[in-house]
């Protein structure tokens, strides 16, 4: 929390307080400039904070002017003094904090606090009463979204409840004692709290860190908590000295309000006095707070107001000097702008360009820098109880534990680290599913010996390529994949046993001499056989296929005398060996996986058929029993009986079926049955009348109910069938099948796959011995990964070339030459016009050439030092500082320049260079690729939030924890190669442009990879032993010398080849499936086209027939038309002839008529 101290960045707690009157005990007067942000005056800390309404400091991004805001609040307090005075006595339910400043104490009061030096304005101003003074802060950048609630806050509070392992702050914030940093708090202590909000927890606010504030009076604070009503009453102090007559209560209240309102501005305006400054130390939640003990001062009287004016004048003089300096700087800026008007115009245009360019690239929220590093050496060979407590504070240590040996240091030395990326996965079957092969292994044999136990931790890891893409955010990945990154600890998982609900345990058991062999301390294969047998019995996994068994850790317990299964076991030492086998060799091949899938499907079919047969058999038996009962108990209808002609046996059967007495003579039986038959006849007649009316309704209801029942039964059967099929279905990718032994551990055993991050998230409440073993293994595995990744980083730093300072020197020399040329030009008072023009042209040419050279140098620097444009948002703080430095250089050059043409050319050149750089950036964004993925994963494992950089102090701790015994000088020399502003931008080492895709891998067996270990005698002995072991790789097997190392290498090669072949086979199968789908689609389309062609041919035939018929009809019509025309022409001729003959006949008739007349 050092960044919250001093006067630069106030800490981010922003709670509002009501400041009226607060009473604090005397010992709370302490100088604490880191929390108040002002000078450590004699003024009481808690009363000053309460009077200012700032019981908790302001947030880090507090941008408002403190002086203006506090003066406005003081004025508002003075205006509301009269009204607030009445409310003080009429509203006792409000929380009122009494500020009893010892300005005018009651008569004969003992001054238990030091004297308070206040400004004169407090004594001379009119009485006022403080109203509620609150300080509003701007919303932090991370919480600008209005819809999201506040997830995290930092504040100061009081411990209200404290239990054995947890407590509460302000009755609302829950914290565990493991989160306390420094001194443990007591009930009533004021503490600094960093809390997070989680709505899914029982207590919404949970404290992540707790730190006790220094110099507190626990008795006084505790009394305030126990008696809150006393806070609202005026403090009565014993009388000792007669200082001044006590003012009336109203005047005293007004004076207190005046103090609380008027002391805001001088308190926070006063600068830190050099005489009162404390040495600056980095304080934080993770460090022990520096306690500053207030010096006791003699009791004295309050001096007249003239004493106050001195300190007020002193503060005013300091402020006036500061204002004079600010005004002087402003005048200098105005003079410089008046001397260069063109520069003023250029500066006025620059913000507009920024406003136009800003929407192109929105700034994203930079993630919080989170790095977790172990604070101890990672090559420790063993630990005892004290060392485990120091290393893992949240780890429960069993009472019988006394020693642990970390043998993974020898199993995975620095020269042969553990290789991630061996794909393996597990699939846990349901307890209903039976294994295909019967499991005959025994978990707890009768002769089990508790002196040795063997347990295994089985790894489930994705492939190396998948691990890179999911955790490293590669430069060539799409943005969705990069934003959804996961830490490698979330992707690396282990198969563990579960005893009960949340009790994880390693899979294994005790050694059996009869089943595993004798002498486990001498023969390492004995415990391996124990692990194979117990794992087979508990999970059904056959570990005999594993080729390498790494002895990861040995845990020893001192067991007292006990009774186990009726026999007394004397006191002994139990050694638990944790093995880490290469379980990925047990993964079934693709063909074996297909056979397993077929076997479980067949098992499901057999079970379904068996269940159906059982159901059918039960149904037949029920039907048969119902038929028999129906034959026996169903009486004959009354219309079919005639009691007078029935025999005695028949009469008795009918009476028994009607639950009537069958005893007596035949006449009695006949009379009894006849009477019953008459009753049945009458009832049936009545029922027939009712039945006719309700028969239809009942029939409909019965059908609907039967249909609903049938549908529900079918639906339940379908759901059950799908559920059972899902239990028997296997995933597409091959996995190791796990059948947990449900009868083991008193029927509470189960299996689960848990990630490394979940195993590391243990609690002190996990107080089981088997949970302790799993948690310890998780810590050791995490430390092994940290060591391997740290060595990878160290190896890369060793391979880097020394940093060249030649370019910096050239740049410096050219700047000096340029400055000298400018000075020579200024000394020339009266140059000739032509001469000046020619000199200006030369200068322009030189500047252009120099600008070109600068552009080349910038490009070279960009190619060498800043290739990661794709993740440039991660480096914005450092990039901003570099840009500020460049801007300062340009500003100095502009101040030195006096020619308008030079400024124009420079401005054009800068604009051209910026445009070119922006284009290059856009071009480089598309061309960045990650070439060193191993190194990127090493950095990402430590940089959990993917900030893109590691600070120098964290990188230094990483190198110190590797066990290489490096000196500080050696580490600093490594850092000079790559560090920039105390940080390492690791993307510069891992990413490069597409053109520079060639990457030289560093030699894993570097000469200096062991650091200074070779200089230590103890390490030399261990190295010699390891060389002897390496030379002893030949063994005699069946009369032949076998080189185990070469066999393992060949096995590894064959495994890689098999994996590649399976991958290719899978790819070919997928392609074949796609080709088959394509062929089927083509065949279907071909069939459709053939059908369409046939249909088209048929249509063409029909069209030809219709065409022929149409042609025949056309010819017929033509013949008919021809004949018609001929007939018409003949008729027309005849008509014409007739018409020609008719006129002569009429003329002859007319002449005859005229002659006769």
Curated annotation (Swiss-Prot):
Residues 289-365, 608-641, 685-721, 804-926 are annotated as: Disordered. Its main location: cytoplasm. Residues 643-677 form the SAP domain. It comes from the Eukaryota. GO terms for biological process: regulation of DNA-templated transcription; regulation of translation. The modification Phosphoserine is found at residue 1157. Gene3D superfamilies: SAP domain. PANTHER family: CELL DIVISION CYCLE AND APOPTOSIS REGULATOR PROTEIN, CELL DIVISION CYCLE AND APOPTOSIS REGULATOR PROTEIN 1. This is Cell division cycle and apoptosis regulator protein 1.
